[in-house]
Amino acid sequence: MAADKAADQGAEKHDGAGTSGITDQEKELSSSALQAFLAGNYDACLQHLNTLQDINKDDYKITLNTAVAEFCKSNQTTTDNLRQTLNQLKNQVHSAVEEMDGLDDVENSMLYYNQAVILYHLRQYTEAISVGEKLYQFIEPFEEKFAQAVCFLLVDLYLLTYQAEKALHLLAVLEKMISQGNNNSKNGKNESGNNTNKDSSNQKAESGALIEVAKSKIHQYKVRAYIQMKSLKACKREIKSVMNTAGNSAPSLFLKSNFEYLRGNYRKAVKLLNSANIAEHPGFMKTGECLRCMFWNNLGCIHFAMGKHNLGIFYFKKALQENDNACAQLGTGSSDPGKKFSGRPMCTLLTNKRYELLYNCGIQLLHIGRPLAAFECLIEAVQVYHSNPRLWLRIAECCIAANKGTSEQETKGLPSKKGIVQSIVGQGYHRKIVLASQSIQNVVYNDGQSSAIPVASMEFAAICLRNALLLLPEDQQEPKQENGSKPNNQLGGNTENSESSEACSNKSHEGDKFIAAPPSSPLKKQELENLRCSILACSAYVALALGDNLMALNHADKLLQQPKLSGSLKFLGHLYAAEALISLDRISDAITHLNPENVTDVSLGISSNEQDQGSDKGENEAMESSGKQTPQCYPSSVTSARTMMLFNLGSAYCLRSEYDKARKCLHQAASLIHPKEIPPEAILLAVYLELQNGNTQLALQIIKRNQLLPSVKTLSDMRKKPVFQPVHSLQPIQMPTFTAVQRK
């Protein structure tokens, strides 16, 4: 579509080139060339242009129009030739775009606009915006049609680079421009009085149709902008306008489906997608958009949000197949290195969405529990989206998940007693019980290879997390807990992402600062700080796994210093700091972190009253029930979290030989949970305490029964304590190592 605009606008230079120094013959040739171009008769157009070039060899505009006509004659497949000609003409007029500083450059505006269109299709969005913004400075002298084309191109570029607020400002300018143009045409009609004829009425009808098309495009762009900003109340108003102006076209239905998806109305979103008539779409060879690929991708996003991850990955794979089929039809282009963008229509340079789809597949596979497959997808996507800190975090999470087995895997090979007894040796009087070692410190994961090699190792996870932290801006304000990633969502030809937990509690202000995180939607300031907290928590965990206790302590301390830290991450921060301090033989400092009173909340995000203050969108309430499920193995309440604190506190007291305090912590913790929920580390701690106390037989009874033996008074006294109310579940933790004793 933009290629057509480039061609049309380039040809229009004939009509606008009339000056006092031009002859009647040149005017006639120019007009004939324009009419032939608009009629699609490019051979006749080129003949007229060649005649003009013979008459006026110094006019570069004729060369420009010739290049555009030849480009259209080739069905827009000679992109490299057009690009080369535009660069030569630009060097002839100006050495750089930055030199555009006067009204004389208005004469060269068509050259720069065509160059911006080329850059747009080559995905060089920053350079295209630079050219477009220079053109926008001189927009007043432009013809109305050309001014609108410049504005629409800039709006598209702003949305592709996730600058939604700039896009909305430009759309307001466009609305005013169209409104003024409409009023001027009405005034002109009134002045002409009875002199109107059939031609003028046809022209008026054509102008009215163009205005309606422009208004419809404005409404669609507004919906895309509001979706990026997660401003659903404003989006709802614009959706109605889109449906009124564009009807049940595929773009309008895809946009409305995206809107319902963000509201949490997933069944309605699926119904809208299914109602879109994809067969009527012109096809990616004409528009550059593979609608079938978008359809399957959007279904995958919706099922991801519903928690149906296996269905989601099925649809994402279908989208990848459609994308690969489209790319196969397009071919690889010219074999000549200088013609790599030629041999296919220019609009199809934007067809390939492989890396966006790989990003989606990676996030989905991570949720399914297939971290290695997710790693392969995300490591390919990060080659393109290397500036996205959240993507680096997801890759690190793949590495962590791949190197941390489930509870069943962790006890594999330890045949009995929940992994407490490793083996039994000897017979009769010499019969001995060998206890399992629980030590996991200083594990080497990379087998001697460089940690910079992209493999799913903990060393590579540390590099990914370091990259993520470096990509975050320094400003820190108002963090709240991030609640997982959504796949990005391509609707109506654009790539968008929604995170339901974030969108439901954030208010879109005009002054909000957005941080780009392609291919996802940009991050708001609050979301950015949530991301910072998640990265710090993962960094502390990875450092502990690698035995880098000083770095782990540094990350844990930074995590605990974050303002408005969520309860779950605060809990993790204290545990990670305590584990690092114990390894550094700073037991007293570790005991301070292991105080159960530090745990007052284990929720995943900010409190409900803060969410109410941060949201003015009544529609967002439906998004709370996204269908996602938190794994059952997570501590689910303050009670279970404090229990874990007490078990670890008892371990710390043992290291200081304060066995009475350790025993008190152990039985206090055991009184708060069901006996079957007591971890094997706590059983080993009880065995260790009894052995230190000389009660060998009692220690053997604990191992035999695989449970803590209740003390005479302590346990009954502890049960009189009030039970804490359960709250939300939280993330898994790495427990500090308990001391295991092996009898000889």
UniProtKB/Swiss-Prot annotation:
Q: Where is the composition biased (Polar residues)?
A: 484-506, 602-612
Q: Would you tell me the Gene Ontology cellular component terms?
A: CCR4-NOT complex; cytoplasm; nucleus
Q: Name one Pfam family in it.
A: TPR_8
Q: Where are the transmembrane segments?
A: none
Q: Which GO terms describe its biological process?
A: mRNA catabolic process; negative regulation of translation; regulatory ncRNA-mediated gene silencing
Q: Where is the composition biased (Basic and acidic residues)?
A: 1-16
Key words, A-Z: Coiled coil, Cytoplasm, Nucleus, RNA-mediated gene silencing, Transcription, Transcription regulation, Translation regulation
The task this protein performs is described as: Component of the CCR4-NOT complex which is one of the major cellular mRNA deadenylases and is linked to various cellular processes including bulk mRNA degradation, miRNA-mediated repression, translational repression during translational initiation and general transcription regulation. Additional complex functions may be a consequence of its influence on mRNA expression. Is not required for association of CNOT7 to the CCR4-NOT complex.
Family, according to the entry, reads as follows: Belongs to the CNOT10 family.
Q: What is this protein called?
A: CCR4-NOT transcription complex subunit 10
Q: Which organism is it from?
A: Gallus gallus
